[in-house]
Regions:
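Phosphate-coordination loops involved in phosphoryl transfer and adenosine-cofactor binding
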Residues: 2, 76, 140-145, 205
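Short hydrophobic core segments
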Residues: 6, 96-106, 228-238
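FAD-site-proximal beta/loop scaffold in flavoenzymes
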Residues: 118-139, 227-275
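A conserved short coil-to-beta-strand element within the FAD-binding core of flavoproteins
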Residues: 76-86, 204-216
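Glycine-rich dinucleotide-binding loop and its adjacent helix/turn
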Residues: 105-165, 258-260
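Glycine-centered tight beta-turn/hairpin loop motif at sheet-sheet or coil-to-beta transitions
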Residues: 91-94, 223-225
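Rossmann-like dinucleotide-binding cores of NAD(P)H-dependent redox enzymes
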Residues: 145-146, 153-210
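Beta1-alpha1 glycine-rich phosphate/pyrophosphate-binding loop at the start
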Residues: 1-71, 153, 159-182
Length: 275
């Protein structure tokens, strides 16, 4: 039996371990175009905060350790398309056929376009690269004011990091309260009190419309007309499933749809994780 796993994050890692546990002889090819071992995106803020060493973002060990523990082939190739009905994985270097294919491509942070926001002042928090870039900027000690868009779990962790560095911080969201998808309003109200007690500014029902300069200071102009000084902007507005390799092959509703066996609309093609 030949297996292909497209993507090597947490879902891909656990899938490879389970496949090898159930099939000692089958060929497992893992497609990943990153040099990094699988990591947990939620741990990136802990690294930026200084609560976690770099290695702590990789709970399963480095690639060498993982390959010693589990027998599989790591193919560092970009997957262009998965031809579902043909069970074919097409990469930049050619194509190969498999009996079973798992799509575990994950998700990417959503980065809306903000007029006037310079790329060097815009920060996401999803990948290891995001965490390294954010930490490097904080070390420059040139940030006095920050705005974070998105009152989410990731958003509040970024706010916590900024607050630790003594940076005046605003947390914005179009929703009426913090954690709009995860908490009841009365719970959110209590959390908001505690966040504000730490000196963080909260503003709901508004977001950034565009950026301006005023007397040398970068200003975030909000959709309600408010003006907030903002040397940097954190974009924590959620994620979007990475479905590019299968977008024309399987059923997708915001993400790849699966049945109770994690099988997509194409027999023999499965999906797991944030995709």
């Amino acid at each position: 039996m030949k297996y292909a796993v497209v993507g090597f994050g947490t879902a891909g890692y656990h899938a490879v371990k389970k496949i090898r546990e159930l099939d000692k002889e089958g060929c497992i090819d893992v497609y990943s175009n990153t040099e990094r071992a699988p990591y947990n995106p939620m741990l990136t803020t802990y690294y930026a905060f200084g609560k976690l060493e770099y290695e702590g973002m990789f709970p399963f060990g480095d690639l060498e350790q993982i390959q010693k523990e589990v027998d599989f082939n790591l193919r560092k190739e970009m997957v262009i398309k998965v031809h579902g009905s043909e069970h074919l994985v097409e990469t930049e270097n050619g194509s190969e056929q498999y009996d079973r294919i798992l799509i575990a491509t994950g998700a990417r942070a959503f980065a809306p376009s903000v007029k006037g926001l310079e790329p060097e002042d815009a920060f996401l928090m999803r990948t290891v690269e995001d965490a390294l870039r954010f930490k490097d900027r904080l070390k420059k000690n040139d940030i006095k004011h920050a705005v974070v868009i998105g009152a989410s779990m990731a958003g509040i962790k970024v706010v916590e990091v900024l607050h630790k560095y003594g940076i005046e911080t605003w947390l914005l969201d179009l929703a009426p309260h913090i954690f709009p998808l995860a908490a009841y309003p009365e719970v959110s109200a209590e959390i908001e009190k505690r966040v504000e007690a730490q000196g963080v500014h909260l503003k709901f029902g508004a977001t950034i419309d565009h950026m301006e300069q005023e007397d040398g200071q970068k200003i975030a102009v909000l959709t309600d007309g408010s003006r907030i000084p903002a040397d940097i902007v954190g974009l924590c507005i959620g994620t979007r499933a990475i479905t590019d390799p299968v977008k024309d092959e399987v059923a997708i509703v915001r993400g790849i749809t699966v049945n109770d066996h994690m099988e997509t609309s194409v027999p023999g093609v499965y999906a797991a994780g944030d995709c």
